[in-house]
Design a protein with these regions (language model features):
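Acyl-donor (CoA/ACP) binding surface of acyl/acetyltransferases
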Residues: 2-107
């Protein structure tokens, strides 16, 4: 599920809810990106909070039990996003995702 992030009539980013596992797990993974010129304005934490509310609580949403956000350890901006929304750190997934030609750890 993909949503566009818009600011003053301009598309500035994207947020998605993927890897949705229904049934007994009821989990999903949130992913996002934002244009460099719009980073740091609070748009991404707002989008994450809105998507989380919809995915977890809204009767029209998938009514998930758990959401994950996976980031590369050195991505400080993404780390700030997850801190602002109150996400809990659970550890490192070693060689979790293939990014730019190499297997990368994610937190």
């Amino acid at each position: 599920i993909i949503f566009l992030m818009e600011h003053e009539g301009e598309i500035v980013g994207q947020i998605s809810l993927g890897a949705i596992y229904p049934g007994p797990m009821r989990t999903g993974i949130i992913g996002y990106w934002i244009d460099e010129d719009h980073a740091g304005r609070g748009l991404t934490p707002l989008a994450v909070a809105m998507l989380a509310d919809w995915a977890l609580l809204d009767p029209t949403g998938p009514q998930l039990h758990r959401l994950e956000i996976d980031i590369v350890p050195e991505n400080e901006r993404s780390r700030r996003v997850v801190q602002k929304v109150g996400a809990k750190y659970e550890g490192v997934r070693r060689q979790y995702m293939y990014v730019h030609g190499e297997w990368r750890d994610h937190e």
